[in-house]
């Protein structure tokens, strides 16, 4: 998912 990548930064 796209959010998966964003959460990876967190």
Swiss-Prot record:
Compartment annotation: Secreted
Keyword Secreted (UniProt): yes
Gene Ontology CC annotation, any one: extracellular region
Assigned keywords, A-Z: Amidation, Neuropeptide, Secreted
Record has Secreted as a keyword: yes
Main subcellular location: secreted
Family: Belongs to the tachykinin family.
Protein name in the entry: Scyliorhinin-1
Natural source organism: Scyliorhinus canicula (Small-spotted catshark)
Upper classification of the organism: Eukaryota, Metazoa, Chordata, Craniata, Vertebrata
